[in-house]
Each structure stands twice: as C-alpha cells, then as structure tokens.
C-alpha cells in the first residue's frame, strides 16, 4: 500500500511541475504585484515596467497561455492581420482607475505584447514610456 502511495505521489509531483510556467528570472520583479495591479491603478506596474522593458528578450519565447500565467490576463487584446494577436496591459492613466488622472487611449502608458500566427510572442513594446534604466 505504501509503495502505491509513493508512486502516485511521484506521478502527481511530476505532473504538477510539468504544468507550471517557469517565470523569467529578473532581479526585483514582483509578478504577483503586477498581476494584482489591474489597469495599473495602484501604481505598482509603473514601478515594474522598466524591468520588463529592459529584459524584453526574456519574454519572447512564450505562448499566449504562458504569458497569461506570468503577467495575468491582459486588460485588452486585439486580433491583428495574419492571425496575429496583441495583448495590452495598462500601466497608467486608464479610465478604469477611479480618482486618478486619465488620458485618451493613444496617450496611456501600456505594455504591448505581439504574438505571431503560431502563438509565439514576437515583440514587446511599452507605449508612451521612457525607461529610466535604458541609456
């Protein structure tokens, strides 16, 4: 009986570890804070976006489901030409944030991640943002 329990436990551990997405290792990055700061209303995304921007290459090997595991569900997504998908994560100035300054859609700070037709992340861009970590 104990042998069966050991085998079942081992199988469950292997299954669990194979289903989780490995987070990109970035010093100072708090993924939980990013996910819980919807639309950037608490300002935590503004503190973290520079780390994502400077480490873009670490986010370019993931598919859409893996990006959702890492950064949470995007606040907006668009289907683009040739079956490309674009995820948008808002950083600042979104109307969903009550009591804060808002701006028009094209003036908001937001993270854009583009996926190709094969569901691979191909580019990452932060709109209306100058990264203080880049020189």
Label each region the model flagged.
Residues 2-10:
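Sec-dependent signal peptide recognition
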Residues 20-135:
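Residues within mature, well-folded domains
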């Amino acid at each position: 009986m104990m042998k069966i329990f050991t085998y079942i436990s081992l199988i469950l551990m292997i299954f669990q570890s194979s289903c989780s997405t490995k987070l990109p290792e970035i010093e100072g990055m708090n993924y939980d804070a990013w996910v819980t700061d919807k639309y950037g209303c608490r300002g935590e995304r503004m503190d973290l976006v520079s780390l994502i921007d400077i480490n873009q290459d670490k986010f370019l090997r993931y598919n859409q489901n893996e990006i959702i595991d890492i950064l949470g569900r995007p606040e907006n997504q668009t289907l683009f030409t040739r079956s490309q998908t674009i995820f948008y994560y808002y950083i600042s100035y979104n109307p969903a944030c009550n009591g804060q300054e808002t701006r028009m859609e094209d003036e908001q700070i937001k993270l854009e991640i583009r996926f190709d037709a094969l569901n691979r992340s191909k580019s990452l861009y932060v709109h209306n943002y100058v990264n203080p970590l880049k020189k």
